[in-house]
């Protein structure tokens, strides 16, 4: 949340207030559990900004760390002049059924940790407090393909409702399991799926008069951080990976082995900011769009992953906060473009709720 434009702070606070009232109306104390970073200044500033938004709602917010070296309150200096205090987590109450800090027993626990490496023992068996999001939303069980399957359903229904081709808002994708890049197993599946997807994309390009070379993105089905990603324009490319490319694709966040991949239609990044390829990122709290920013990378092209060295963020005052179109202006005028981004973000959030509901049923 460090890239959220300050102009949208009131909207963010209102959205956070709405979310908290639904989850824990009597909440006074909230515990924020971040990722295990102490050196990533951008991430720590994000945690501080998120805590500030929550404090503006009237909550007492403290930050509990899972890091074993945090054994006492530890204050970190941030690059913007602020400080952030991390405190050691501890189990509270009879039988340790609650999670909190020394002299701090929260109503709710907000995870800003994606649980890529699994659920730590400290977070297990919490039956008396709200954990937001629930543990089964972590990347130890979550898969990108399940999210996009749910998004496909939502986008299809929405497109039928307003009379557009769902392909305009729903990129094609396929999945391959049983992959081992080091041992070169699963290459046949990967090659076939890349070939199939490129064929379908070419057909859609012809149908829509798009004069571009189609491409797909091969990415790890689990995990975040822009790891394990490659751009492919021909199926032969995935058969002829050199050792360096295989090593890059084989491991994701927390050093976990990549065994499942998603092959996703590549969408050319046509926007630029200060001569850099730029893609919009939309912030949401609860069901509200609260602003956004551009991820910019001057070292990457329109068909590449921008989450890579050379990346920077441009917090932009998205006109009207992505919530109001302007019918007097052209369809691609900034207020209307940002409104369209906000619509897709809300569809994606609805898809995430469906994905989460299904994971609860399956757990």
Spell out what each predicted region is.
Residues 3-27:
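Short N-terminal or domain-adjacent regulatory/targeting segments
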Residues 34-36, 90-92, 110-115, 135-136, ...:
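Short, flexible loop/turn elements at secondary-structure junctions
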Residues 193-215, 222-316:
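Phosphate-binding site of ATP-dependent enzymes
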């Amino acid at each position: 949340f460090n890239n959220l434009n300050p102009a949208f702070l009131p909207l963010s606070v209102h959205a956070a207030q709405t979310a908290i009232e639904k989850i824990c109306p009597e909440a006074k104390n909230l515990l924020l559990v971040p990722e295990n970073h102490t050196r990533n200044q951008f991430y720590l500033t994000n945690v501080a900004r998120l805590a500030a938004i929550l404090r503006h709602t009237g909550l007492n917010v403290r930050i509990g760390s899972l890091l074993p070296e945090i054994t006492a309150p530890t204050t970190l200096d941030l690059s913007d002049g602020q400080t952030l205090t991390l405190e050691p987590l501890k189990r509270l109450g009879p039988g340790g059924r609650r999670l909190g800090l020394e002299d701090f027993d929260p109503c709710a626990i907000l995870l800003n940790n994606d649980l890529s490496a699994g659920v730590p023992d400290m977070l297990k068996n919490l039956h008396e407090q709200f954990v937001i999001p629930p543990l089964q939303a972590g990347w130890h069980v979550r898969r990108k393909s399940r999210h996009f399957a749910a998004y496909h359903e939502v986008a299809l229904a929405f497109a039928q409702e307003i009379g557009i081709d769902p392909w305009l808002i729903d990129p094609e994708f396929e999945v391959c399991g049983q992959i081992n890049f080091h041992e070169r197993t699963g290459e046949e599946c990967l090659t076939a799926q890349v070939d199939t997807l490129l064929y379908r994309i070419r057909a859609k390009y012809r149908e829509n008069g798009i004069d571009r070379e189609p491409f797909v993105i091969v990415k790890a089905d689990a995990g975040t951080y822009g790891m394990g990603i490659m751009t492919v324009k021909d199926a032969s490319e995935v058969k002829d990976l050199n050792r360096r490319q295989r090593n890059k694709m084989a491991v994701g966040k927390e050093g976990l082995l990549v065994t499942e991949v998603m092959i996703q239609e590549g969408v050319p990044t046509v926007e630029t900011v200060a001569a850099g390829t730029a893609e919009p990122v939309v912030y949401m709290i609860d069901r509200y769009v609260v602003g956004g920013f551009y991820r910019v990378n001057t070292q990457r092209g329109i068909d590449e992953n921008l989450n890579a060295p050379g990346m920077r963020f441009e917090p932009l005052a998205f006109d009207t906060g992505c919530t109001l179109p302007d019918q007097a202006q052209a369809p691609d005028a900034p207020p209307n473009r940002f409104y369209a981004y906000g619509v897709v973000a809300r569809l994606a959030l609805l898809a995430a709720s469906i994905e989460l509901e299904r994971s609860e049923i399956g757990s």
